[in-house]
């Protein structure tokens, strides 16, 4: 059974250019993380947003919800920034017949010591 991984940005995919600079949200890192962990499960990755979760609007939560509802997979992982993950989870609570897991990171996946 295939798992859908929907990415929204957050710390998971942040890129810092140096210790004093701003960041950007890069391409999703989840495939390389799973490859590095020798994960052999069937999955597909879909990038929905590339934002810090503090910048996600209610309209964008609607986009996330629509993507979840339209997803053919019943098992869905959403990578999301930790600051507003709870708000998005509450927004998705009425989606039925799908198992939805939101996950985030405190350190970007591109860092050597990451929790992504």
PLM regions: where:
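Active-site histidine-anchored catalytic micro-motif
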Residues: 1-116
């Amino acid at each position: 059974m295939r798992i859908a991984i929907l990415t929204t940005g957050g710390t998971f995919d942040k890129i810092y250019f140096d210790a004093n600079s701003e960041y950007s949200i890069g391409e999703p890192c989840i495939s390389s993380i799973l490859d590095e962990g020798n994960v052999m499960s069937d999955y597909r990755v879909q990038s929905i947003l590339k934002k810090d979760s503090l910048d996600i609007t209610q309209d964008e939560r609607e986009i996330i919800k629509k993507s979840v509802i339209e997803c053919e997979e019943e098992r869905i992982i959403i990578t999301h920034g930790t600051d507003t993950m709870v708000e998005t989870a509450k927004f998705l609570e009425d989606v039925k017949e799908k198992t939805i897991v939101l996950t985030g990171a405190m350190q970007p996946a591109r860092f050597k010591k990451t929790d992504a």
